[in-house]
Amino acid sequence: MVKVIASSVRKGNVLDVDGKLYVVLTAQNFHPGKGTPVTQVDMRRISDGVKVSERYRTTEQVERAFVEDREHTFLYEDAEGFHFMNPESYDQLVMSADDIGDLKAYLQEGMAVMLSIHEGIAIAIDLPRHVTLEITETEPVVKGQTASSSYKPALLSNGVRTSVPPHIQAGTRVVIATEDGSYVERAKD
């Protein structure tokens, strides 16, 4: 464990609060006109997923847990969870669907991901910034419809809905941002 000042806490850090591990969801520094500056930290307890909000004085010491980020390859999903393999040691780790959250829709077999590991347990996952998916369903474009928004709804091959430009048709492969599920560009493959 490493002690750091609260103002240096960032999203994705893992904190040890009263012997329990929390992953930081957001951390904002506030400097009110009067009084001491504070850092508002929203966290999720790793053991059970409970969300907690804490306020620390910006100079207050908090314990940051030692977490190692290692590249792993996504293998498959089964009733046990999502299976990942370390390409160097061939060790396998399993993460539950709750730990992965909404990112599970973007996981593809063979995809390289970064796992945050604390004492041999995967506690967080970081996907590539972009994934390539196929459009399975989209509305036909209406000619002359330039006055309204230039994007139309589309359904991706992973079941996620997004908005795409009018020239994109069903069957087209597109690049999607994993952070928010937004359209980036047409795939170049």
Curated annotation (Swiss-Prot):
Which stretches are annotated as coiled coil? none
**What InterPro entries does this protein map onto?**
Elong-fact-P_C (IPR015365), NA-bd_OB-fold (IPR012340), Rib_uL2_dom2 (IPR014722), Transl_elong_fac_P/YeiP (IPR020599), Transl_elong_KOW-like (IPR013185), Transl_elong_P/YeiP_cen (IPR001059), Transl_elong_P/YeiP_CS (IPR013852), Transl_elongation_fac_P (IPR011768)
Quick one: a GO cellular component term?
Answer: cytoplasm
Give the UniProt subcellular location, in the record's own words.
Cytoplasm
The entry's family comment says: Belongs to the elongation factor P family.
Q: What does this protein do?
A: Involved in peptide bond synthesis. Stimulates efficient translation and peptide-bond synthesis on native or reconstituted 70S ribosomes in vitro. Probably functions indirectly by altering the affinity of the ribosome for aminoacyl-tRNA, thus increasing their reactivity as acceptors for peptidyl transferase.
Q: What is this protein called?
A: Elongation factor P
Q: Which organism is it from?
A: Sinorhizobium fredii (strain NBRC 101917 / NGR234)
Q: What is the lineage of its organism?
A: Bacteria, Pseudomonadati, Pseudomonadota, Alphaproteobacteria, Hyphomicrobiales
